[in-house]
């Protein structure tokens, strides 16, 4: 248990409305920064960013240099005791999620601190609603059959926010006896950098294998070199969780890479080319001419997708989540 600090809260917030001792202690540490004239958004965004970079750089060497520069740039704005306070806040986040993994800790705290109104007018779906959505989404028999046939299944939230829906889905898998750490690949995307980092932190600390893509889902949706999402197109905007670096997932990534390398290159065959026909006389060509059609052309029918291109589960079954 954490002891409550004595004294008044700087910004007049009522910590009694925050659940759990870890949450209350984190809010108190957070608001100490505000007494130094910093805005809530600046402190929150800096803490989330340096925490996400610390987690990422521990396992992801491909983006280490760039993100380390960003970390040092932010750290230069704070004193050493303040950076230590950031570390303590991250430790409180770890404790809170260990104590109760069935929550959207950062999303709820984000809304409690009023940051949703200050930044883009965002509003996160409450976690208990996400629980209901996940319970309806997870088709136990079909889902487990796909895992049995393919070894694992990928789930994607194209507008992840702080990751509440994916967290709820992971907890729903656990309740139904599905080991999400080895059987589910979590793919998240959000246009908001800080919100995406909140999702990344929660996914990482809860041991969810996958990655978060920062970008506009409509303009630049997350795409992958392979069909199952193991090899995302990475333009520096992909954040891989530490669990994705475990042997079981590294083996799957390696096999996906080998499959791409060993795929045969399709060559045009002469037999498939259209055969030339003997030249026809002008009289014969006139007979072949079609009469002019005065009717308006009808709209072309939409071609049906080949069976192999159909998704494993339709988006209608998964709602906001999609499976592949």
Regions found by a protein language model. Name each.
Residues 202-319:
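S-adenosylmethionine
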Residues 23, 42, 61, 70, ...:
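Residue-identity detector for glutamine
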Residues 1, 11, 83, 89, ...:
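Detector for methionine-enriched segments
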Residues 1-18, 298-324:
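Intrinsically disordered, low-structural-confidence terminal and linker regions
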Residues 129-234:
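Conserved S-adenosyl-L-methionine
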Residues 71, 78, 110-112, 127, ...:
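Sequence-level detector for tyrosine residue identity
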Residues 28-31, 184, 238-239:
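Generic preference for hydrophobic/aromatic residues in regular secondary structure cores
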Residues 6-159, 163-177, 321-324:
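Class I S-adenosyl-L-methionine
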């Amino acid at each position: 248990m954490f002891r409550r600090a004595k004294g008044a809260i700087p910004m007049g917030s009522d910590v009694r409305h925050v659940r759990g001792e870890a949450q209350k202690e984190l809010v108190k540490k957070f608001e100490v920064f505000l007494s130094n004239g910093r805005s809530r958004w600046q402190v929150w965004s800096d803490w989330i960013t340096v925490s996400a970079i610390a987690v990422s750089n521990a396992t992801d060497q491909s983006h280490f240099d760039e993100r380390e520069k960003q970390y040092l740039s932010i750290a230069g704005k704070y004193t050493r005791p303040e950076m230590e306070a950031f570390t303590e806040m991250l430790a409180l986040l770890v404790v809170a999620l260990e104590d109760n993994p069935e929550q959207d800790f950062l999303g709820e705290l984000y809304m409690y601190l009023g940051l949703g109104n200050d930044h883009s007018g965002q509003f996160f779906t409450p976690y208990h609603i996400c629980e209901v959505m996940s319970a309806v989404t997870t088709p136990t028999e079909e889902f487990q059959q796909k895992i049995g046939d393919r070894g694992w299944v990928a789930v994607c939230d194209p507008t992840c926010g702080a990751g509440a829906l994916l967290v709820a889905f992971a907890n729903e898998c656990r309740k139904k006896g599905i080991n999400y750490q080895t059987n589910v690949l979590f793919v998240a995307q959000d246009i908001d950098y800080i919100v995406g980092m909140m999702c990344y932190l929660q996914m990482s600390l809860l041991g969810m294998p996958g990655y978060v893509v920062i970008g506009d889902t409509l303009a630049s949706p997350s795409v992958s070199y392979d069909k199952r999402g193991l090899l995302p197109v990475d333009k520096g905007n992909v954040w891989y969780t530490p669990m994705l670096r475990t042997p079981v997932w590294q083996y799957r990534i390696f096999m996906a890479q080998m499959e791409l390398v060993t795929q045969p290159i399709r060559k045009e065959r002469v037999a498939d080319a259209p055969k030339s026909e003997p030249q026809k006389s002008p009289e014969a060509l006139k007979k072949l001419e079609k009469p002019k059609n005065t009717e308006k052309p009808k709209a072309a029918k939409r071609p049906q997708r080949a069976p192999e291109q159909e998704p494993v589960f339709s988006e209608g079954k998964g709602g906001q989540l999609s499976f592949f």
